[in-house]
Swiss-Prot record:
Transmembrane parts of this sequence: none
Record protein name field: ATP synthase epsilon chain
Subcellular location: Cell inner membrane
UniProt GO cellular component terms: plasma membrane; proton-transporting ATP synthase complex
UniProt xrefs under NCBIfam families: ATP_synt_epsi (TIGR01216), PRK00571.1-4 (NF001847)
Any GO molecular function: proton-transporting ATP synthase activity, rotational mechanism
Domain of life: Bacteria
Membrane topology value: Peripheral membrane protein
Entry keyword set: ATP synthesis, Cell inner membrane, Cell membrane, CF(1), Hydrogen ion transport, Ion transport, Membrane, Transport
Name of encoding gene: atpC
Taxonomic classification: Bacteria, Pseudomonadati, Pseudomonadota, Gammaproteobacteria, Vibrionales
């Protein structure tokens, strides 16, 4: 029996990152983790910085880092519109580690609520990038 699929587009302000048929995808929404399958109820929600895990035909996985944005689900199609989207294999582990180190340093040396919020956001983004890199390497 053939897998039931739907169309998914992952786009950023710069370019289309992914377009194709998928069995499912997961993303971090504003209220928690979302798993989207064919036939999902229509949905429009904000997404947090993190990973889009795409399961294509035959269980093949792809991981994409997103810095935030929105996800829209309609019958037979879904779109992830990200502020920034980068395929796992295109992420730079050294840059992500350095961003993580700087963010931790900024949290320790913060001078107000705004500094802390910005540093915490940068730390979350760096950790998400490192997680996508890790999962992409495991897949190979």
């Amino acid at each position: 029996m053939a897998a039931i699929t739907f169309h998914l587009d992952v786009v950023s302000a710069e370019k289309k990152i992914f377009s194709g048929r998928v069995e499912t995808f997961q993303v971090t929404g504003s209220e928690g983790e979302l798993g989207i399958f064919h036939g999902h109820t229509p949905l429009l929600t904000a997404i947090k910085p993190g990973m889009v895990r795409i399961v294509k035909l035959h269980g093949e996985e792809e991981f994409i880092y997103v810095s935030g944005g929105i996800v829209e689900v309609q019958p037979g199609t879904a779109t992830v519109l990200a502020d920034t989207a980068i395929r796992g294999e295109e992420l730079d582990a050294a840059k992500a580690e350095e961003a993580k180190r700087r963010a931790k340093e900024n949290i320790l040396n913060q001078h107000g609520d705004m500094d802390f919020a910005q540093a915490a956001s940068e730390l979350a983004k760096a950790i998400a990038q490192l997680r996508v890199i890790e999962l992409t390497k495991k897949r190979r």
